[in-house]
């Protein structure tokens, strides 16, 4: 998903 990772900066994989 995007924007829902541990950073929330639009990461593709968290």
Curated annotation (Swiss-Prot):
It is found in: Plastid, Chloroplast thylakoid. Keywords: Chloroplast, Plastid, Thylakoid. Coiled coil: none annotated. Disulfide bonds: none annotated. One of its GO terms (cellular component) is chloroplast. It comes from the Eukaryota. On the 2D-gel the determined pI of this protein is: 5.7, its MW is: 14.3 kDa. This is Unknown protein from spot 103 of 2D-PAGE of thylakoid.
